[in-house]
Amino acid sequence: NTLRNDNPRMNARVNFPTNQPKKILLTSKDCDKELNFFKDNDVQIYKNKDLAQIIKSFKDQDFCSILIEAGPKLANSFLQLGLVDEIISYTSNNELGDKAVSWFKENNAIENYGFKLESSYKIDSDIKEVFKKNG
């Protein structure tokens, strides 16, 4: 749903030459290839739901860092399996509407997964928070 709802580009938009990130999509649904995500880059699509196996395949491809842009369900799946060592969260005052889903509820807070707030920055009216895994 995140891909359809947000229509992200997921690329580096800078004024100098740079390597673009390798785009990987984890989905159980068919996707509209006209979405921004599919432009400018090859996309690997995984329909397998075994996240640990998918992460192992990334290691086999010599990935040294993975940025996960996900909705609450997938993000929490990665957290519950212990596959996350850093969380970067952006908070905005903009209303998301009635389809928005809360990331972390009271009994499912970031701290419950062993993360500690490392830094917090104000960017215009938004807040960027970086959480690191303890230990």
Language-model features and meaning:
Residues N1-G135:
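Enzymes that bind and transform nitrogen-containing heteroaromatic metabolites
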